[in-house]
Amino acid sequence: MTSYSYRQSSAMSSFGGLGGGSVRFGPGVAFRAPSIHGGSGGRGVSVSSARFVSSSSSGGYGGGYGGVLTASDGLLAGNEKLTMQNLNDRLASYLDKVRALEAANGELEVKIRDWYQKQGPGPSRDYSHYYTTIQDLRDKILGATIENSRIVLQIDNARLAADDFRTKFETEQALRMSVEADINGLRRVLDELTLARADLEMQIEGLKEELAYLKKNHEEEISTLRGQVGGQVSVEVDSAPGTDLAKILSDMRSQYEVMAEQNRKDAEAWFTSRTEELNREVAGHTEQLQMSRSEVTDLRRTLQGLEIELQSQLSMKAALEDTLAETEARFGAQLAHIQALISGIEAQLGDVRADSERQNQEYQRLMDIKSRLEQEIATYRSLLEGQEDHYSNLSASKVL
């Protein structure tokens, strides 16, 4: 922080402003030149006014810079050369200090201008030759990202295909086990049908044996009856005609044969109808089972297709979400960096403005000091001109 001080000391003297201050001079006036100490760039500048001692002379220049000397003319005449020389030295010292202050002010202005030039925006550089490289790198990054996403998608598709094949294998294995179970069930049904057929065949064999047994008994009865008929004595009796045994036996044989044939046909018809009924039931159940299996297979395939499509969509969604998150993170970091740069530049701009305001205030203060010094120099000049006129009048009166 640049500090300026204006110090004034005197034993019995006072300086006033232009609006009505007073200046006192006395015999043996002693002046001390004002001193200016300036640091680098105008910092730490200290201005102290001249010191003079007066005992009995006073003058006022409240409005018209008029001055009255009350000291004895003899004392002034005796110290005329010394006083004038002292005043001239003090005036020269004031002028030198003013020039030094102006030089310091000029240096300060140059430094302020240099500082503004350094802090201001420099000449714009041509970065157009970097744009192609940046665009190529961005294209490569984008291509690598797309390739990575494609590879990830292929991996997911391969995983889904493997899961699909595993599911299909498990499904086919389950179907194979189901078919084997159905085959085992049909084998049990076939065994039951075989047992039923064997039972029916045994029944037919029993009926055939029974028919053979009946035929045998019938033949034995016929043989017995024939033997009985052959051993009888022919006795002619005048009676009613007897029954024809051969005809009776023939009728019985025909009846038994008809009954046996009817039983055989009934058994064959029952066996055939039962077999056909069982075959129809087996065919109906088999067809229904095949339809149910085909329907279940179609539903499973549809479910697998939907699951594969769902997994593909979920994988694509996850990949897109990852890409979106990566893009948001990258552009968020870039935005934060740009925002930090903007904040830093705004802070620097605020510092520059504050420093510029401070430099302007210091400049105004220096200009005020310069104007006051110029006013004091003008006052001294008017006083010196008044003293020279007075001394000239005194010298002329003495000569006369």
Swiss-Prot record:
| Function as written in the Swiss-Prot or TrEMBL entry | Involved in the organization of myofibers. Together with KRT8, helps to link the contractile apparatus to dystrophin at the costameres of striated muscle.
Q: What are the boundaries of the region Head?
A: 1-79
Q: Which residues form the IF rod domain?
A: 80-391
Taxonomy-wise, where does this protein's organism fall, top ranks first? Eukaryota, Metazoa, Chordata, Craniata, Vertebrata
How are the domains described in the entry? This keratin differs from all other IF proteins in lacking the C-terminal tail domain.
Provide the residue span(s) of the region labelled Coil 2: 249-387
Give the highest taxon in the source lineage.
Eukaryota
Identify one Gene Ontology CC term for this UniProt entry. intermediate filament
Where is the stretch described as Linker 12? 226-248
Family statement: Belongs to the intermediate filament family.
Set out the biological process GO terms recorded for this chain's protein: epithelial cell differentiation; intermediate filament organization
User: Which residues are recorded with the post-translational modification Phosphotyrosine?
Assistant: Y391
Determine if Coiled coil is one of this entry's keywords.
Answer: yes
Q: Where is this region: Linker 1?
A: 116-133
Q: Which UniProt keywords apply?
A: Coiled coil, Intermediate filament, Keratin, Methylation, Phosphoprotein
Subunit note: Heterotetramer of two type I and two type II keratins. Interacts with PNN and the actin-binding domain of DMD.
Question: Under which name does UniProt file this protein?
Answer: Keratin, type I cytoskeletal 19
User: What else does the entry mention about this protein?
Assistant: There are two types of cytoskeletal and microfibrillar keratin: I (acidic; 40-55 kDa) and II (neutral to basic; 56-70 kDa).
